[in-house]
From Swiss-Prot:
Region (Flavoprotein-like): 135-588
Catalytic residues in the record: 419 (proton donor)
PROSITE patterns with a match to the protein in the record: MULTIHEME_CYTC (PS51008)
Cystine pairs: none
Transmembrane segments: none
Native source species: Shewanella frigidimarina (strain NCIMB 400)
Official protein name in the record: Probable fumarate reductase Ifc3
Cofactor(s) it depends on: FAD; heme c
Function comment: Flavocytochrome that catalyzes the reduction of fumarate to succinate in vitro. Is essentially unidirectional, catalyzing only fumarate reduction. In vitro, can use the artificial electron donor methyl viologen. May be involved in an alternative route for electron transport to Fe(3+).
Taxonomic lineage from the root: Bacteria, Pseudomonadati, Pseudomonadota, Gammaproteobacteria, Alteromonadales
GO MF: FMN binding; metal ion binding; oxidoreductase activity
E.C. number: 1.3.2.-
Residue positions binding fumarate: 187, 394-395, 521, 561, 564
């Protein structure tokens, strides 16, 4: 029988009474007092970097997250969009716990149990160059055919593709949980020529996908990469579905001429659905996935071929993994303030919607060995990040019918324009913010909107007039905006701003609004790759043994990325990178 009474007590402590139950200085001591060190650790005690055994012990006593979920709590860490992550992501054995939710949110809650425990310096705070060089001099402590760095969508897809091609794979990530930026993606995956489009009667063409992406990127994209993205996008959706993902729903993202963004039915966010699917597939296929394992240096031989990497493990320290192929899938640098200030100084004070792991590690390591960069100084702002927060208000909300207005309640641009144009337009409005407004129809249709309500981000009014008063908008202006927009929906033509897709009117009470402003969302550039996802050197020649996919790369999206193309990028080029990395390794 699981310790459900203890679980309930601890859940209440987390969100109410602080450290009331903690009579010992830390969680490890608490469990030792109840039994022994072996209550958590294997005998003899040897903790892996992923803390796999310890997490299994947690669940053997306390139950899986589904059992721990408590719908009586306003915010339930055990039932969140992060999915089934490691217990030790937040609960620490012999040190102060860490409430990871507040890395993005600002929940006003009491301390977690054992929060009076000693706070230790982060295990990966800084890189010890002497130890890195010693690890290289000692040579590989183990070898694999393919080493994948970064366990987001690109990394998981690369690992699964390499495994399918017959290679042995090790997948590492510096975070205590997998997912990366993909885990917090809300929109979906763009694809052309899918069964979903056929079922919904949507006519689309590969040429249209390419044209839309190139136009959105201001013609600065590498058209060869965009063509591959378009041509292989439908197969990417089918691949995810074969692994168990649900992508039945369709909507239109900004810059697309038709509905081509595939997402889960019921209004769920796409990121958790895709990452949970990939996590399960990697586990089922026996891929060696290591968390708390930060790659700190790529290792090259005298011929300048990549032959492995130095890893800094939370418990194992610095060691080298020898690999015939390495895939970089480390994401962008949207959370690296120094890199943002250097490459895009005008955005250095902006908030970011990114996962805290998006610190540009892969870019820096690739530059160190002579990799070429492309579009590295282009950074995309998402127009609708919750004002004074890091919570992304998904483009899906506008895509399924919401309207954007300024502080007075007046529209100022088509809601489905590209992100760069929408961001620029918002920054030209009084106060440099906007309101996203919608009615109860959209509230019921888009599940993520109910999440914003749960986070107390929504303003509400039983009438349009009440909504205007609660937000400070001008009553007459907002009333006219809603009336005019409903007329456009009825006629099928937006004569004010030319919005092509208007799936919902605003006629059903109550009415809602959420305050938004632009925030750093996607770093457009990174390492240069070719059509096989090989990383290029300064002479535009492939670096032997090094591949890359996802936001760590540049060239796919040009100056500005369209919503839905990032997940497509991670799936399509993640698979290409993994497949070619495996072929390279197996041929050596």
């Amino acid at each position: 029988m699981k310790l459900k009474y203890l679980v309930s007590a601890m859940a209440l402590v987390v969100l109410s009474s602080g450290t009331a139950m903690a009579k010992t200085p830390d969680m490890g001591s608490f469990h030792a007092d109840m039994g022994s060190c072996q209550s958590c650790h294997a005998k003899p005690i040897k903790v892996t970097d992923s803390e796999t055994h310890e997490n299994a012990q947690c669940k053997s006593c306390h139950g899986e997250y589904a059992e721990l979920a408590n719908d009586k709590l306003q915010f339930d860490p055990h039932n969140s969009h992060l999915g089934d992550i490691n217990c030790t992501s937040c609960h620490k054995g012999h040190e102060e716990p860490k409430f990871y939710c507040n890395e993005c949110h600002s929940f006003d809650i009491k301390p977690m149990p054992f929060s009076d425990a000693k706070k230790k310096k982060s295990w990966d705070d800084g890189w010890d160059q002497d130890k890195i060089q010693k690890a290289i001099a000692a040579g590989p402590s183990e070898t694999t055919q393919v080493l994948v760095v970064g366990a987001g969508s690109a990394g998981f897809n690369a690992s699964l593709a390499a495994k399918k091609a017959g290679a042995n794979v090790i997948l590492v990530d510096k975070a205590p949980f997998s997912g990366g930026n993909s885990m917090i993606s809300a929109g979906g995956m763009n694809a052309v020529g899918t069964k979903q489009q056929t079922a919904h009667g949507v006519e689309d063409k590969v040429e249209w996908f390419i044209e839309d992406a190139m136009k959105g990127g201001r013609q600065q994209n590498d058209i060869k990469l965009v063509t591959i993205l378009a041509e292989q996008s439908a197969d990417g959706v089918q691949w995810l579905e074969s692994l168990g993902a649900n992508l039945d729903d369709l909507k239109r993202s900004g810059g697309a001429r038709v509905d081509r963004t595939h997402r889960p039915h019921g209004g769920k966010s796409s990121g958790p659905e895709i990452i949970d699917t990939l996590r399960k597939a990697a586990k089922e296929q026996g891929i060696d996935t290591r968390l708390n394992s930060r790659v700190v240096k790529l290792v090259v031989n005298d011929d300048h071929s990549v032959v492995g990497a130095v890893v800094h493990g939370k418990h194992t320290g610095y060691y080298m993994i020898g690999a015939k192929s390495v895939v970089l899938a480390t994401g962008g640098y949207g959370m690296n303030k120094e890199m943002i200030a250097y490459y895009r100084p005008t955005m250095k004070d902006m908030t970011s919607s990114n996962n805290i792991t998006a610190t540009g590690d892969g870019v820096l390591m690739a530059k160190e060995i002579g990799a070429s960069m492309t579009d590295i100084d282009w950074v995309q702002a998402h127009p609708t990040v919750g004002k004074d927060s890091r919570i992304l208000i998904s483009e899906t909300v506008r895509g399924v019918g919401a309207v954007m207005v300024n502080k007075d309640g007046n529209r100022f641009i088509s809601e489905l324009t590209t992100r760069d144009k929408a961001s620029d337009a918002i920054l030209k409005q009084p106060g440099q913010f906007a309101w996203i407004i919608f009615d109860n129809q959209l509230y019921k249709k888009a599940k993520m909107v109910r999440g914003y309500d749960h986070l107390e981000m929504l303003y509400k009014g039983d009438t349009v007039e009440q909504l205007a008063k609660s937000t400070g908008m001008k009553v007459a202006d907002l009333a006219k905006t809603v009336s005019d927009y409903n007329g456009y929906v009825a006629s099928g033509k937006d004569t004010a701003f030319g919005r092509a897709d208007m799936p919902l009117n605003m006629t059903q009470s109550p009415y809602y609004a959420v305050k938004v402003a632009p925030g750093i969302h996607h770093t457009m550039g990174g390492v240069a790759i070719n059509t096989t996802a090989s990383v290029l050197d300064l002479q535009s020649k492939p670096i032997d043994g090094l591949f890359a996919a996802g936001e760590v790369t540049g060239g796919v999206h040009g100056y500005n990325r369209l919503g839905g193309n990032a997940i497509a990028d991670t799936v399509v080029f993640g698979r290409i990178a993994g497949d070619n990395a495996a072929k390279h390794a197996l041929d050596k």
